[in-house]
Design a protein with these regions (language model features):
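Short hydrophobic/alpha-helical segments at membrane-entry points of transmembrane helices
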Residues: 115-124, 250-251
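Short helix-capping/hinge motifs at transmembrane helix termini and TM-loop junctions
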Residues: 40, 109-114, 143, 178-182, ...
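C-terminal ends and interior cores of transmembrane alpha-helices
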Residues: 96-115
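Substrate-agnostic recognition of the 12-TM MFS/MFS-like secondary transporter fold
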Residues: 11-28, 63-80, 87-99, 120-183, ...
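Conserved small/polar residues in nucleotide/adenosyl-binding loops
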Residues: 307-309
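A single, central transmembrane helix in multi-pass transporters
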Residues: 239-297
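Juxtamembrane intracellular "pre-TM" segments in multi-pass secondary transporters
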Residues: 2-10, 213-251
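Short amphipathic helix-loop junctions that connect adjacent transmembrane helices
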Residues: 26-56, 267-284
């Protein structure tokens, strides 16, 4: 393997290492408890969110849903742009700025009045989710350029393993910080803010080592309007031919249900643990840590299994 290719794969994996801090420390372990406490203090058991009465865990679910839905709506357009123009790395940087920047800004919630703190977290968390999901479109589009077809599983699993380890290591540091300060407010702010810095900081390996892929038949001057038309038409053309690819269609449908189920569990597990199971933040963090350090070697095990099958 050439040095350039090795660095490119390393840079690709380091993006997962960085952004997993948001998915573990922020989305699952720390922020749900902080959000629930602020929501309860400001509103009581229920509050009004965009005209609807909601509990804290329902409001949290709404933020996750809106972030995912917004990206899903524009995915055909940005997917076409990613495939037809050499902007994958540029767009990945933009979305990382949005996601990581919004995460760090969550830490500023205490500067506002108590009635607005949970609203600030809701908005910043929504923007962070949009950044994460949109970045995922361009990040995943880079995978086929990191190696040959037979190497895709190995590279993908390696990136997952890096993500579990990176997110787990930062969560250990956050656990030590929070326990030694008796969960002081400033410690919570540092934990949240550092997650955004961790995400963007390690993403620089990706920006430095992963090159913008070449594209055959690049479309010049492709704007959002044209990309939307092209993206929607390609989606409908593909769906109209599903009978010719029944096995692939069933696989895609099954994968859609499977991966959305996984993403829903990981995004809402923290809120569920706090609001329904009554876990403390410390208990929730310990649970997530166990999961992270079981998943890390498991991802490498699957990689080795694929190599020898």
């Amino acid at each position: 393997m050439s040095e350039t290719k090795r660095k490119s794969i390393f840079g690709y994996c380091m993006y997962d290492w960085g952004k997993s801090a948001f998915e573990t420390s922020v989305t699952t372990a720390i922020l749900p408890a902080w959000f629930a406490a602020l929501f309860l203090e400001a509103n009581g058991l229920t509050g009004t969110v965009i005209g609807m009465e909601m509990t804290s865990d329902a409001a949290w679910s709404l933020a996750v849903t809106l972030g995912t839905l917004m990206v899903a709506i524009v995915s055909p357009s940005i997917g076409v742009i990613a495939d037809r123009k050499r902007i994958k790395m540029v767009a990945l940087k933009w979305m990382t700025w949005l996601g990581a920047g919004s995460v760090s800004l969550i830490a500023l919630a205490p500067v506002f009045d108590i009635s607005f703190q949970w609203v600030w977290i809701f908005v910043m968390f929504l923007l962070a989710n949009i950044g994460l999901n949109a970045a995922g479109v361009f990040y995943n589009a880079l995978l086929p350029y990191q190696g040959e077809d037979h190497e895709m599983d190995e590279i993908s699993n390696k990136a997952y393993a890096y993500g579990y380890l990176g997110g787990g290591l930062l969560l250990v540091a956050h656990l030590v910080l929070l326990f030694t300060t008796d969960f002081a407010l400033w410690a919570t702010q540092v934990a949240i803010g550092s997650s955004g810095i961790w995400w963007f900081g390690f993403a620089w390996y990706t920006f430095a080592y992963v090159a913008e892929p070449e594209i055959e038949n690049e479309i010049e001057n492709l704007n959002i309007k044209d990309a939307t038309k092209l993206g929607v038409s390609e989606v409908f053309n593909t769906l109209s031919e599903w009978r010719n690819f029944k096995t692939l269609f069933i696989y895609m449908l099954a994968y859609f249900l499977f991966i959305d189920g996984i993403n829903s569990v990981t995004s809402l597990a923290g809120a569920f643990g706090i609001a329904v199971l009554g876990l403390t933040m410390g208990e929730l963090i310990m649970t997530i840590l166990i999961i992270q350090f079981v998943a890390f070697p498991a991802a490498f095990f699957f990689t080795l299994s694929l190599i020898h099958i």
